[in-house]
Regions:
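Short, surface-exposed "cap/lid" segments of acyl-processing enzymes
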Residues: 80-87, 91-135
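Catalytic-loop region of hydrolases
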Residues: 31-100, 354
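Alpha/beta-hydrolase active-site loop
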Residues: 159-180
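Short alpha-helix in the alpha/beta-hydrolase fold that links the catalytic acid
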Residues: 203, 328, 342-352
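C-terminal catalytic histidine-bearing segment of alpha/beta-hydrolase fold enzymes
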Residues: 304, 308, 313-314, 331, ...
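Short beta-strand/loop motif that positions the catalytic acidic residue
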Residues: 332-338
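Accessory cap/linker subdomain of secreted extracellular hydrolases
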Residues: 222-322
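Primarily recognizes the serine-hydrolase "nucleophile elbow" in alpha/beta-hydrolase
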Residues: 174-242
Length: 398
């Protein structure tokens, strides 16, 4: 097992403290999350400038393998072209960069929340959350890790809005090229889990047109959110599914103006709003969310299935992952015990890619649930990514 299995130990320790902390949580309230500071605030003049250019950066300690980490604020765009600022992390390997610069791997993170204070760059366990990061850095790859729009920077966060995520991912790679040893690095791979799997696939879909100066060598995704309508429908009767549906509806009501009141029962609105304010960093956060979302088991939606109701039906289709240009190889990993992103949905997406002419490596993970799909596939993903940078023929399971 690769060293990112550290997060398993972190999660186990956090879970062991649940009994100790649970009374304090309900007497005193949840422990306060990190808050944004002036680093994340921008003016109109700050945002003006080329996409992917740096607004500011500051050092961040704690990266593995002697690497140098920077918290960054960079310029990007909304899907409609509106300029925005996005935050994230850039990690540069230790040592002298090779000729041509360090190759770059963009890390696309899984769900952390939908409000600004849920940005991974604010997280305590930031580096442990990046599946495969130690091996990537030891192997001589720089990492560009976006927070996504509206996390860190002012919200709302466009949760599961694929093109928004992808633009932020690509512009994080552009921002990384501002650092020594990366100026001439135009090749990158993207690797993500869950929400980040969706971001990775959308990155593959738009990279050629959005960033023609960059060369995307491969797309790797673990338990990606692909067919959003099917995933929402499959998960409505599970605790995790209700949580993610609530987050999606809350976010899209603000991003798209899709009425929350038309699909959520009046008695559930306060619970949905409360869940939106909670971040997900570790096992304890999941425990708190489970307790907070308990009322939704009795009263949640005012419609049978939001996926069949406009505008949600159209929005879910718009943000479903499509096929990629056939020349971009794809790595997919899927936990067979995943009850949030069902294996059949990922398998169906693989078949779509195959029919479109893509080269796809599919890794099935026995006895692996959703939360660990990224960590348990990270070694295989890093090896696969290394092969793409080395120019070796991509394995094909189609």
């Amino acid at each position: 097992m690769e060293r990112e299995g550290e997060l398993r130990l972190v999660a186990m320790k956090l879970w062991a403290y649940v009994v100790f902390f649970v009374n304090a949580v309900y007497v005193l309230g949840p422990l306060p999350a990190a808050s944004q500071n002036a680093f994340y605030r921008t003016s109109e003049s700050d945002i003006a400038g080329p996409v992917g250019s740096l607004i500011r950066e500051e050092p961040r300690s704690g990266a593995a393998a002697g690497a140098i980490a920077h918290k960054v604020l960079y310029r990007s765009t909304k899907p409609d072209g509106t300029p925005i600022a996005v935050s994230g992390i850039v990690i540069v390997p230790a040592g002298q960069a090779p000729a041509g610069g360090w190759p770059i791997v963009a890390w696309a993170h899984p769900t952390t929340g939908v409000v600004p204070r849920c940005a991974p760059s604010l997280a305590i366990f930031l580096f442990q959350q990046m599946a495969g990061s130690r091996r990537l850095l030891e192997g001589g790859y720089a990492i560009a890790a976006t927070d996504y729009p509206g996390l860190g920077t002012p919200g709302p966060h466009p949760y599961l809005v694929g093109e928004s995520e992808a633009r932020a991912v690509i512009d994080s790679v552009r921002a990384a090229r501002s650092f020594p040893g990366l100026e001439n690095s135009n090749r990158f791979a993207v690797w993500g889990h869950s929400q980040g799997g969706q971001a990775s696939l959308f990155t593959g879909m738009i990279a050629k047109t959005y960033a023609p100066e960059l060369q995307l060598v491969g797309v790797a995704a673990a338990a990606p959110a692909t067919d959003l309508a099917t995933l929402m429908t499959d998960d409505l009767n599970t605790m995790g599914g209700r949580n993610l549906t609530a987050m999606t509806i809350w976010s899209w009501s603000r991003v798209y103006g899709a009425s929350m009141e038309e699909v959520v029962a009046p008695a559930a609105i306060s619970t949905v709003n409360a869940l939106a304010e909670q971040c997900i960093e570790g096992a304890f956060d999941i425990y708190v969310r489970e307790k907070m979302s308990a009322p939704l088991e009795k009263t949640f939606l005012s419609v049978k299935n939001p996926a069949t109701v406009e505008p949600y039906r159209t929005l879910l289709e718009r943000n479903a992952a499509g096929v990629l240009p056939a020349e971009i190889p794809v790595f997919l990993a899927q936990g067979l015990k995943d009850e949030l992103v069902r294996p059949a949905v990922t398998q169906a997406y693989m078949q779509r890619l195959c029919k479109a002419g893509s080269t796809v490596k599919m890794l099935d993970l026995s006895n692996v649930s959703h939360g660990f799909a990224g960590y348990d596939s990270a070694d295989a993903a890093v090896d696969w990514i290394a092969g793409r940078f080395a120019g070796r023929a991509a394995p094909n399971d189609c």
